[in-house]
Amino acid sequence: MGTRDDEYDYLFKVVLIGDSGVGKSNLLSRFTRNEFNLESKSTIGVEFATRSIQVDGKTIKAQIWDTAGQERYRAITSAYYRGAVGALLVYDIAKHLTYENVERWLKELRDHADSNIVIMLVGNKSDLRHLRAVPTDEARAFAEKNNLSFIETSALDSTNVEEAFKNILTEIYRIVSQKQIADRAAHDESPGNNVVDISVPPTTDGQRPNKLQCCQSL
């Protein structure tokens, strides 16, 4: 029998990218398990966790993938990005080099991910305000220039972690919903599973959303 965690209307794959040590793993654990590990070690390979939220009465299940930031693990790039509909591009507000590398990560994302992927720039470790090396206005301007949403977070004290994930998931949901509406208006309704992809309008049956709607293929 299925568990309550199996009951969802949409499944969205969201990836965490950015330099090693910026706090990607702790953002993941804070959002999915409300945990923070001061002694967390660098991720080796790939891991993911899930959490469901409600948006407009729909259950959105987020499958959030975390990967190592080190170059020696970048061979997994293609599989990591496959099917992702959202990305959190994370830097450390107290380490300017991690912000400088955002441009390289953004290029990698553009090269390997779907062209319609929703991207949020995340300045993590906002609790280290006394060590700030990246001005908020500078990062916000970069995000606007590159059509990214922007937020500063602290996985340590939980500041804006919920908001970051919920905002990007809601934005993805809005895009998917608009595509469903447009597709419904443009095509005759036909039976079949609803497989949602933000780059390809889904087929809908006009009935109750299929439990296994999803936005990613593993």
Curated annotation (Swiss-Prot):
Q: What is its EC number?
A: 3.6.5.2
| Recorded topology in the membrane | Lipid-anchor
Q: Where does Mg(2+) bind?
A: 25, 43, 66
GO CC field: cytoplasm; cytoplasmic vesicle; mitochondrion; phagocytic vesicle; phagocytic vesicle membrane; recycling endosome; recycling endosome membrane; synaptic vesicle
- Write out the domain note: Switch 1, switch 2 and the interswitch regions are characteristic of Rab GTPases and mediate the interactions with Rab downstream effectors. The switch regions undergo conformational changes upon nucleotide binding which drives interaction with specific sets of effector proteins, with most effectors only binding to GTP-bound Rab.
Lipoprotein recorded as keyword: yes
Q: Explain the purpose of this protein.
A: The small GTPases Rab are key regulators of intracellular membrane trafficking, from the formation of transport vesicles to their fusion with membranes. Rabs cycle between an inactive GDP-bound form and an active GTP-bound form that is able to recruit to membranes different set of downstream effectors directly responsible for vesicle formation, movement, tethering and fusion.
Q: What is this protein called?
A: Ras-related protein Rab-11B
Q: How is it modified after translation?
A: Citrullinated by PADI4.
Show the catalytic activity: GTP + H2O = GDP + phosphate + H(+)
**Binding residues annotated for GTP, in chain numbering:** 20-21, 23-26, 37-38, 40, 42-43, 69, 124-125, 127, 155-156
Tell me the InterPro entries matching this sequence. Answer: P-loop_NTPase, Rab_GTPases_membrane_traffic, Small_GTP-bd, Small_GTPase
Family membership noted in the UniProt record = Belongs to the small GTPase superfamily. Rab family.
Looking at its record, which EC class is this enzyme?
hydrolase
SMART domains, per this entry? Answer: RAB, RAN, RAS, RHO
Q: Which cofactor does it need?
A: Mg(2+)
What CDD domains would the database entry show?
Rab11_like
Give, from the UniProt record, the effect of changing residue 25 to N. Answer: Dominant negative mutant locked in the inactive GDP-bound form; partially relocalizes to the Golgi and alters endocytic recycling
The answer to keyword Protein transport applying to this record is yes
